[in-house]
């Protein structure tokens, strides 16, 4: 069943907000959903163990029964780059290990499964590996979340170039307006639409409450071909 790897042009540009919106749109259409965020840092201690807000947001939009540990198998407390957090904790952070964990979620064969990365495309894992190596092992088409602000065109085009250069398909992109005061906003969006070699799945404005339902109202799943 359709599955996609969700990446972004940078950290803190709304990958999870958009991923949760995509999952909500699928659920609203009567489709089953599942998700994974295989590694997360900045997690909070709870009685059940470390929990990450982004992973919990994705879990909340999964229609299939999933344990938190299936969605987020590697959770670290320090709010630092995952490879640094893993090194401090003495934990293996290899693409192969993350691949095995994600395969468990993919095996559920939901109508839509999203695997969300951390940060951007070249976030380091251990050794010389990056999260992009996980995407390559999974061989999933990619959805790129573009945080629309100053510099986003360069970030988006470089990200798309890297994705395609790694042999993966760019299935679509979403314009997430993180800075509504961006100069020449409409011209920037037009340039992105012209230059990015994939369909735009939606333009999400800066929302007062960016709930999955509110975000989903600005998204279109049809270009992903998931049978809506």
From Swiss-Prot:
Substrate binds at residue 41. It catalyses: (7R,8S)-7,8-diammoniononanoate + CO2 + ATP = (4R,5S)-dethiobiotin + ADP + phosphate + 3 H(+). InterPro entries: DTB_synth_BioD, P-loop_NTPase. The keyword Ligase applies. It is an enzyme of class 6 (ligase). One of its GO terms (cellular component) is cytosol. Signal peptide: none annotated. Its cofactor is Mg(2+). Its main location: cytoplasm. Mg(2+) binds at residues 16, 54, 116. Pathway: Cofactor biosynthesis; biotin biosynthesis; biotin from 7,8-diaminononanoate: step 1/2. The active site is at residue 37. ATP binds at residues 12-17, 54, 116-119, 205-207. GO terms for biological process: biotin biosynthetic process. Keywords: ATP-binding, Biotin biosynthesis, Cytoplasm, Ligase, Magnesium, Metal-binding, Nucleotide-binding. GO terms for molecular function: ATP binding; dethiobiotin synthase activity; magnesium ion binding. It is found in: Cytoplasm. Its EC number is 6.3.3.3. Catalyzes a mechanistically unusual reaction, the ATP-dependent insertion of CO2 between the N7 and N8 nitrogen atoms of 7,8-diaminopelargonic acid (DAPA, also called 7,8-diammoniononanoate) to form a ureido ring. Homodimer. Belongs to the dethiobiotin synthetase family. This is ATP-dependent dethiobiotin synthetase BioD. It comes from Pseudomonas aeruginosa (strain UCBPP-PA14). The lineage of its organism: Bacteria, Pseudomonadati, Pseudomonadota, Gammaproteobacteria, Pseudomonadales. The gene is bioD.
